[in-house]
Amino acid sequence: MRHYEIVFMVHPDQSEQVPAMIERYTASVKEAGGQVHRLEDWGRRQLAYPINKLHKAHYVLMNVEAPQRVIDELETNFRYNDAVLRNLIVHTKAAVTEASPMVKAKESKVAEAVAEVESEEAGE
């Protein structure tokens, strides 16, 4: 089985359906004997340029190990799901399990905020 990195963007009005979509897509990978190595829900983010007059979208990143037929099935699901604005499926050489730069940046912001609050409390 090959390793793939999958990113898809969902219409912002359909954000509440994203967990169900993720569950459906991960279930199809696991049913075929594949494995999900990394799953990140980046949430609603600003688009670089408008798509269908939209300026925001809900982003999801998945790193999976799956047979080609499952990837073809996912691609078909993305194509015929009106809620999915864009998708990208890239073949990778190995499984990627470390956190993406998006998550690392978010974690560092949280750590900075916590440190700032602690320093303010210590200064009182």
Swiss-Prot record:
KW RNA-binding (keyword) present: yes
Molecular function in Gene Ontology: small ribosomal subunit rRNA binding; structural constituent of ribosome
PROSITE patterns: RIBOSOMAL_S6
UniProt keywords, alphabetically: Ribonucleoprotein, Ribosomal protein, RNA-binding, rRNA-binding
Keyword NAD: no
CC per GO annotation: cytosolic small ribosomal subunit
One Pfam family hit: Ribosomal_S6
One GO BP annotation of this record: translation
HAMAP family, per the entry: Ribosomal_bS6 (MF_00360)
Similarity annotation: Belongs to the bacterial ribosomal protein bS6 family.
Annotated function: Binds together with bS18 to 16S ribosomal RNA.
Name recorded for this polypeptide: Small ribosomal subunit protein bS6
Phylogenetic classification of the source organism: Bacteria, Pseudomonadati, Pseudomonadota, Gammaproteobacteria, Pasteurellales
Name of the gene encoding the protein in the UniProt record: rpsF
